[in-house]
């Protein structure tokens, strides 16, 4: 977007080249653009403050060229009219409503996901309780198996001692028979 001078800036440029304050008229045209007119500008441009003198065409052309160059503004964009602004406002409102709808839908989806997460959390807690109960059962079975192993170990010791006694009894019987 290019720079566009204000009315005050234009009057300041005019005062740079001239010595009096000009009466300005600023009107809004039907197409929405501004029309600016300044009374008495070109008569004063060729005069030096306090003195009146003749100027050549070349000097006049140069002064007018300098003056126009200072006033020259490149306009690549046109100024928006009220209808353009209203249309733009309507488009913005439509986009805003669409975004609000999207946010509302996403909010509902978040609520649904939150409920699903709560259900999954409850299911995981139940499974955790089941796993804990199974762990306790396994621990009880393990304790029972350890007790059985200890019992079998003591039975094995008894059987070993009984076997030793039986062997010694058998040896005695063999000695008695051999005599």
Curated annotation (Swiss-Prot):
* SUPFAM superfamilies noted in UniProt: MPN010-like
Q: What's a Pfam family this protein contains?
A: DUF16
Q: Which cysteines are joined by disulfide bonds?
A: none
Tell me the first and last residues of the signal peptide: none
Gene3D superfamilies in the cross-refs: 6.10.250.40
Family to which the UniProt record says this protein belongs:
Belongs to the UPF0134 family.
Protein name according to UniProt: UPF0134 protein MPN_145
């Amino acid at each position: 977007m290019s720079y566009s001078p204000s009315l005050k800036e234009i009057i300041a440029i005019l005062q740079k080249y001239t010595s009096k304050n000009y009466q300005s008229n600023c009107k809004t045209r039907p197409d929405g653009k501004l029309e600016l007119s300044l009374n008495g500008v070109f008569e004063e441009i060729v005069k030096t403050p306090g003195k009146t003198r003749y100027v050549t065409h070349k000097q006049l052309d140069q002064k007018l060229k300098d003056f126009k160059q200072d006033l020259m503004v490149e306009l690549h964009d046109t100024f928006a009219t009220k209808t353009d602004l209203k249309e733009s406002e309507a488009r913005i409102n439509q986009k805003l409503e669409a975004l609000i709808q999207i946010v509302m839908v996403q909010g509902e989806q978040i609520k649904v996901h939150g409920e699903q997460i709560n259900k999954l959390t409850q299911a995981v807690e139940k499974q955790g309780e089941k796993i804990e109960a199974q762990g306790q059962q396994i621990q009880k079975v393990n304790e029972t198996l350890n007790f059985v192993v200890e019992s079998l170990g003591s039975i094995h010791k008894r059987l070993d001692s009984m076997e030793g006694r039986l062997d010694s009894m058998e040896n005695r019987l063999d000695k008695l028979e051999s005599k």
